[in-house]
Regions:
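Catalytic-core helical/loop segments in enzymes performing group transfer/polymerization on anionic/lipid-linked
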Residues: 1-212
Length: 212
């Protein structure tokens, strides 16, 4: 565990979450420039790209790191006396090891609480609509966020990763093709067709000349 004691509060207009590669970061550059670099926080997962984008605001998420000490101690206390026994009972009843799931939920809660309590923003967006997290979205709204959003990266297939999406706004590829997400138990309050961010960065912005 790597913990922090001092809380430094910052304000942004937009937080871009779950950035996992330099290529993905490049796709967001136009949106970041629209808001202004100083008004956007980019959250990466287990890797650093600050050297490539030195004038952007970054925060790197690593499991159970950069958490606030008192939040961590409180969580450990509650889990030792209550949570661990609930998870153990459910694991026995279902014959499924639920401890990895519980650890993931705890990590999401602690990191999201630290992130949003000290980095307040109006909007939250991510590229991978299948990695939305209800706990994260709840805490984002609790600490003053207006809307958690995501682009639609690809078609919604019959796969478990597309189950139970949790979003205020989905920026969809088109006017259809997203009903499966609702049927799979997802919460999407508003669907706004905008097209493909991948197509924009990978095709339209490159000005290809097509010979007729």
């Amino acid at each position: 565990f790597f913990c922090k004691f001092k809380k430094i509060k910052r304000k942004y207009d937009l937080i871009i979450d779950y950035i996992t590669s330099s290529i993905e970061m490049h796709r967001w550059k136009k949106l970041i420039n629209f808001f202004g670099k100083s008004h956007v926080l980019c959250v990466t997962r287990d890797f650093k790209i600050e050297s490539e984008y030195f004038d952007y605001n970054f925060k790197n998420q690593k499991k159970f790191q950069n958490l606030y000490f008192f939040d961590l101690i409180k969580s450990i206390f509650k889990e030792l006396f209550f949570g661990i026994w609930i998870v153990f009972k459910v694991s026995l009843k279902t014959k499924v090891n639920c401890f990895p799931i519980a650890l993931n939920i705890i990590n999401t809660y602690l990191f999201s609480k630290t992130l949003f309590e000290n980095n307040k923003a109006k909007f939250l967006i991510q590229e991978k609509h299948y990695n939305t997290e209800p706990v994260k979205n709840y805490l984002f709204k609790k600490y003053g966020g207006l809307a958690s959003t995501s682009i639609q990266k690809n078609i919604i297939a019959l796969e478990p990763i597309f189950f139970y999406l949790d979003l205020d706004i989905l920026f969809s590829l088109g006017e259809g093709g997203f009903k499966r997400a609702i049927n799979y138990g997802g919460r999407i309050d508003l669907i706004q067709p905008v097209g493909s961010l991948f197509m924009e960065r990978g095709w339209f912005d490159k000005n290809f000349k097509i010979k007729k």
